[in-house]
UniProtKB/Swiss-Prot annotation:
PANTHER family: PHOSPHOSERINE PHOSPHATASE. This is Protein CicA. InterPro entries: HAD-like_SerB, HAD-like_sf, HAD_hydro_SerB1, HAD_sf. Transmembrane segments: none annotated. CDD domains: HAD_PGPPase (cd02612). Pfam families: HAD.
Length: 222
């Protein structure tokens, strides 16, 4: 129960934390999926939200999955998944669903050892940033629960009246795009005190960190 209460703090907020911040002496960036969590949160969210429609939706994604085998373009595959499972939903609906998902699954998704390191940096007064390839709308409730100062994630294309159009607004936030997005906020000479990741998509972010943590978290939720 304590884990659920801790995760629920701040989940009533309605917007991802994507505003500008001033540079601080201690700046720490964490990847989300596989680093702070034990598995991909976006796939888990889509499956949970789709319910019995999940299998049919995946079947309809077959052409995109086959294309990925050849081009290895994660952004194209993610855009196809957004079109299949989220297109037409309102941003408000997705935000509400993301909050419900975080409240239900944070205790079974978050790595306890990663959260402990996160809290350790926070106790030192570091500015804490999550930089993720998952959509910012989906990760925002987790980021708020963790007390993140900033969330940088993949943005979804939305209409002026607040509906998901399908596809991505800009590039998939992985690899060099993570550094590009960090520089947009903190300037071209940004340097991270520490960074943590678990895939090749985090290499560029780790390269601008003084302390690099690659696949160092192995903890499983109780």
């Amino acid at each position: 129960m304590a884990k659920r209460s801790w995760m629920a703090k701040g989940l009533s907020a309605s917007r991802p934390m994507t505003g500008e911040m001033g540079h601080e002496p201690l700046l720490v960036a964490f990847d989300f999926d596989g680093t702070l969590t034990v598995k991909d949160s976006f796939n888990a969210f889509l499956k949970w939200r789709a319910g019995p429609r999940w299998s049919f939706g995946v079947l309809r994604l077959t052409p995109a999955l086959i294309a990925y085998v050849f081009d290895r373009n994660r952004g194209k595959l993610k855009a196809a998944a957004v079109r299949q499972f989220l297109k037409g939903a309102t941003v408000a609906q997705i935000e509400n669903d993301a909050r419900a998902f975080a409240e239900a699954f944070a205790p079974s998704l978050l790595r306890p050892d990663a959260v402990a390191v996160w809290r350790g940096w926070r106790a030192k007064g570091a500015k804490m940033v999550i930089v993720t390839a998952s959509p910012d709308l989906i990760v925002a409730p987790f980021a708020r629960g963790l007390g993140a100062d900033l969330l940088i994630g993949t943005r979804l294309r939305c209409s002026d009246d607040g509906r998901i159009l399908g596809g991505l607004d800009g590039n998939n936030c992985r690899a060099k795009e993570k550094v590009i997005r960090l520089r947009e906020v903190f300037g071209p000479d940004v340097r991270l005190t520490a960074a943590y990741g678990d895939t090749s998509g985090d290499t560029e972010m780790l390269a601008i960190a003084d302390e690099k943590g690659y696949r160092i978290f192995r903890g499983k939720p109780a």
